[in-house]
């Protein structure tokens, strides 16, 4: 499942590669918008887990994520914009993403352990 990316006004500026797994980069600061990019790499996590992002309160910004799936790994790139405001709101926003990243890695680890156990039983 691949969602079409949101078209930013200056697309060339946004083509820079995101940071490695689970890192959050504060990529660009415009006069009224701050843009963050998160790149998450993990194996075999359900789409239901991705929907958790929508349940966390992202009331202050626009959230968009693009998912590329292949048989080895899921790659998710999340772009979201946040109206310039207090650093408290921004930090809370970013920490929600960090919690989600940790959750995804735990789920992936748990899934792989279950797969190993199944193979041992056979």
Curated annotation (Swiss-Prot):
Partially overlaps YOR365C. This is Putative uncharacterized protein YOR364W.
